[in-house]
Amino acid sequence: MVIKCAFKECRPYLNELETRFGLAHWADQSSGFSLHYDDTGLSLYKTDEPKLGAISVDFVTGAAAHRRKFGGGKGQAIAKAVGLNKGATPIVLDATAGLGRDGFVLASLGCKVILHERHPVVAALLYDGLQRAYNDIEIGPWMQQNMSLIFGSSHTLLAQCESMPDVVYLDPMFPHREKSALVKKEMRVFQDLVGADTDADDLLEFAYPLASKRVVVKRPDYAPFLNDKTPSMQIKTKKNRFDVYVKAAMKK
């Protein structure tokens, strides 16, 4: 049993998670992390840094709920980057889903978002968060319509895609330049768990032919262009920027 849990009645669900995402194989290959399940859902801990606390996915309460209600709607930089300010509600393929925060913002604004995640633990956390969101009275109906997960490498999945999404969204892991004490706990855990996306440059080559309207790449403000390709336009925030590679106009 990879996932630790005090509730026997939860074991069938946890066995399903372990099988679906190959967590036993991951546990055999990895050390320094532990997975726990309780009434708040699935959580990841870095065992040698307990003060960092738990990493989990919660779309229903907390920061996600606050951003959904008060985050600025279609005026947000990410919304402009995918073309929501044009009056469209595009189908977005989030090829580097992570914990799904950006995908959730877009789904809450009406986009249909397909999440790709290749790391088994991250995918399991994301899947668990989605199940709880699907069952929520308030957001469940539109979450079931607007947000779905496919587990696997985006390089493989993009090559297999038969239908063209309007937008392919990329947010590859990039080494953080700040001192470790200043980096968010989540980023520190992720960098140890997943590492940098050393094959990220290749993603743009897969993504561009697949997107019917545009590719959007989220980058730290100090990071170079992905694959050294100059974007059609940029939308900048305080710490990040969205490099937008436009192929065709958005239609309402």
Curated annotation (Swiss-Prot):
Documented EC number(s): 2.1.1.242
Keywords linked to the UniProt accession: Cytoplasm, Methyltransferase, rRNA processing, S-adenosyl-L-methionine, Transferase
Catalytic reaction equation(s): guanosine(1516) in 16S rRNA + S-adenosyl-L-methionine = N(2)-methylguanosine(1516) in 16S rRNA + S-adenosyl-L-homocysteine + H(+)
List of residues binding S-adenosyl-L-methionine: R101, D102, E117, R118, S153, S154, D171
One Gene Ontology cellular component annotation held by this UniProt entry: cytoplasm
Residue pairs linked by disulfide bridges in the UniProt entry: none
Pfam family name, one: SAM_MT
Enzyme's top EC category: transferase
HAMAP family in the cross-refs: 16SrRNA_methyltr_J
Recorded family membership: Belongs to the methyltransferase superfamily. RsmJ family.
PANTHER family: RIBOSOMAL RNA SMALL SUBUNIT METHYLTRANSFERASE J
Protein name per Swiss-Prot or TrEMBL: Ribosomal RNA small subunit methyltransferase J
Lineage: Bacteria, Pseudomonadati, Pseudomonadota, Gammaproteobacteria, Alteromonadales
Gene: rsmJ
